[in-house]
């Protein structure tokens, strides 16, 4: 860190906005404020006021003393989910107006052959997709000139329709962007207040549908993201921030607002994408680099997998039914949070989620007007949370209200007890989360028994051990800052810019053009370095370039991404690259064809400026071991067939390093509870992380 004292991470979630403040002495503090979806700056102001009160300083003094303020946000994600983006017009090559609906000729995976599955909502209605004459062909040459009269006509129509953003995507613009560049200039000149983006800039790789879809999503979200960034930047400027606010990207890196307001598609997973970085940091003191990080907040349940210290990425994938081409940390998101609503479906079956009570009105026990029981209400009814406890330091829980809601909405209609209904709610939400974990592990060739489970989010501590039992994980790690782990991950992250290009080329020795290939790698690297310099980084920072090549067997239509360990290829490293591709193909598809020719399709280069991390917490180890003493006991129910148990409750602030506590018990931290079920034990590590393992 620099001479400034603090680094601040802010994660704006659906229910709470989390603040992590770290200083240069290893102190990490967590604060929470209820989210304000209508204006994110209100939650940030409230959180900064809490921090100021705790430190005896003003918000302006704290911000002025921060070397970096980082914001992860769900603004872009929520706009895509709720369809609250802006009105978009599309300029496309004549004859390609329907590519968004034709897609790849089928629906997304999981519904490919389901004739009853409805088509995705189109972000650009048919009448706003305007065909433009002119054609670039695959070698980059102009087959026919751009029809500027058609562009003028489209501009007039967009003006009449009050379009707020224009996406431009022409065929083969990745080989020659001149037509897109001319169209952009014309639209910007005629419609100066309208946001404009083009496919060759947003996603400069082949495949028309993916490029068009990604560009349209970017146009749909960027004005929304831009307004949010404008308010946040103004707030921090008002408070005297020494550096521009950095925003967390879906690729796990940071970028300034001036970049993110133009590339909102890179912020779709801005919130949950920081969790795996934090998960790896939490696991490091234990010598673990295979982790599955699960983040259960009030609204959703996010799952990421990291193997060997590297987090899985997705690219060219369907996200909320829209094809997104840009690289993103692979996050599996479920509608399973503390605020997920339990209800009976049309057949009288108990269901949990995906609807959520959110921050307002929230669960019934919040006393803010909620009437439908949630997962949090069930946890409170079963004794895992304390009646009258302050959630997040500000919301007092009402157990009787939770019990009454479960009785009237679930138990009585089903003819069962409140206890059985509450256990059923917890069981169902756990099964849903286990299914999600299996999708990111077993279905992608990973054995979850080889991974530690990292619990993040305010609600995860009450569920994660049951999830570990189901998937066979033998280690669960829950840091004291678990409920703010995404904000914690933000302060550990680096500046990152991804550069992409397409370069079709046979990789056989007799066909490959190493000079052209190395020149393309150098150009990507230089573009990324330019981005870093424009962002004010690159001088004193350690720069790292990570390369990956998308390769396939000749004639295939999909590629495998293979990492390149050098920044320049020769004959020897080319042979090693081909062998790495064969191995990767076999790992993914169970076979390889070493004697078949292979071809390169795409190149990627991630240019990263490594930032100095703030030091991590280090708790003192007592000279003499003592037994942990419960702060009290309360009845809890762990199974519908069992009796209530008088269960010890421990105050997390009084647990010392090295003390081993046997379950069942609950550990109460300021912003989360950890449920240790029967058959598990827990101890506190000097890194301020609870380690939970099965056994006595």
From Swiss-Prot:
What's an example of a GO molecular-function annotation for this chain?
ATP binding
Q: What is the effect of changing residue 295 to A?
A: Retains very low activity
Q: Does the keyword ATP-binding apply?
A: yes
| GO BP field | glutathione metabolic process
SUPFAM superfamilies noted in UniProt: Actin-like ATPase domain (SSF53067)
What are the alphabetically sorted keywords of the record?
A: ATP-binding, Hydrolase, Nucleotide-binding
Q: What induces it?
A: Induced during growth on caprolactam.
Q: How does it assemble?
A: The caprolactamase is a heterotetramer composed of two alpha subunits (CapA) and two beta subunits (CapB).
Q: What is this protein called?
A: Caprolactamase subunit alpha
UniProt source species: Pseudomonas jessenii
